[in-house]
């Protein structure tokens, strides 16, 4: 069922792939391009999201809603999805507003599955 949510999410313009990873770094579901090592990306995304959560708490920002890694060739966005983290890989030039709204809806569906 999570795979269906990811497949639908991947239809959004600019999204190259998506996955749900546990807070422990283990892949729960993945719809990433074949050239991407899902287990490696999942472990790194979980670590990055965890560090961002701790940073947000330490500086008094409250609960972390989203974190983004932006590079020359694309972006990686991560949002809390209950027992997991929704990770989305995008092109460099994307409509971030659309991506964020679409991710929020997908994360809500995923939360309901846990």
Swiss-Prot record:
Gene3D superfamilies the record matches: Dynein light chain 2a, cytoplasmic
InterPro entries cross-referenced by the UniProt entry: LAMTOR2-like, Roadblock/LAMTOR2_dom
GO biological process: cellular response to amino acid stimulus; positive regulation of TOR signaling
GO molecular function: guanyl-nucleotide exchange factor activity; molecular adaptor activity
SMART domains, per the entry: Robl_LC7 (SM00960)
Domain of life: Archaea
Protein name in UniProt: Uncharacterized protein MJ0310
């Amino acid at each position: 069922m999570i795979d269906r949510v990811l497949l639908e999410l991947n239809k959004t313009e600019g999204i190259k792939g998506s996955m749900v990873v546990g807070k422990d770094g283990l892949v729960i579901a993945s719809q990433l391009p074949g050239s991407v090592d899902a287990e490696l990306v999942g472990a790194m995304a979980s670590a990055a999201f965890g560090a961002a959560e701790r940073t947000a708490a330490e500086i008094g920002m409250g609960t972390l809603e989203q974190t983004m890694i932006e590079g020359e060739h694309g972006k990686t966005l991560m949002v809390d999805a209950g027992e997991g983290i929704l990770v989305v890989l995008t092109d460099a030039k994307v409509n971030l507003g659309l991506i964020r709204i679409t991710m929020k809806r997908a994360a809500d569906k995923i939360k309901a599955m846990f």
